[in-house]
Amino acid sequence: QQGIAPNVTLGMAAALSANGENNTGSETRVADAIRWCVFNFEADIISLSLGGAQDQSASREGPAVSATRQAVDAGIFVVAAAGNDGGSSDDGFVSAPGNVNLVITVGAADREGNVWSQSSMGESLDSDGNVRVYPNQKPELTAPGVDILSTGMDNQWYTSSGTSDATVFVAGALALILEAHPELKPNGQSTTACIELVKRALVDSMNSDTQHDSKQGYGQLKASAWLGQIPDEISC
């Protein structure tokens, strides 16, 4: 079997604890894992199949969010799960640190493209109280995230559903874009300009009129079209 982006160098950071409660973890530990990706592993993309509840006074600007801001400010792409609290229990917020403006935040959809019932709704305001605008409304998109077949323990196969599953599809597609356009990768002197360019290309690849839905985002992942929206000559 071959994954979406077989040529990547994959780094794994233990951000959660296997404690019998769905691998929960502290924000501090998640923040430490993100900073390891930034400073030790020197990642181009950080894929976060995790998230915390949106406490207006804590999680939205807690350690994990601060570490994520540090990553994107350095030009590192961050892709994060929108969260799985959709339906009647939806609090109206994507999970942290997916609430950070320049993060690509991913909801889940089924094989027919229908938004998964548990995929979290996005909020209209950012953490500073400003109205979110193109291309940073949350979530930005949906990707396959229902009954996803993958490998498990002891040479077993298993299926799972959630925005965490959807996140890795987007991270893989983004890895292929950086492979085709290595000039987009962070280089130690990077700003957020390349992230902004790639996010605009993402939205334009799905939705030419940039209409946004609070659960589906700007549309469904179209990896080839996303790549096609990246200009041949890049200045960022």
Label the model's feature ranges.
Residues Q1-S26, F41-D44, D73, N99-V103, ...:
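Subtilisin-like serine protease catalytic core
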Residues G3, T9-A14, V38, D44-S49, ...:
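Structural recognition of the beta-strand scaffold that forms the well-ordered cores
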Residues A15, I34-A58, A81-A82, H181, ...:
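Short acidic, glycine-rich surface-loop motifs adjacent to enzyme active sites
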Residues L16-N19, G51-D55, N84-S88, A109-G113, ...:
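Solvent-exposed loop/turn segments at secondary-structure junctions
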Residues R60-V78:
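Catalytic-core regions built around general acid/base machinery
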Residues G83, A223-C236:
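Secreted peptidase-domain scaffold signal
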Residues S95-E179, A225:
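Extracellular S/T/G-rich loop segment that most often corresponds to the catalytic His/Ser-adjacent loop
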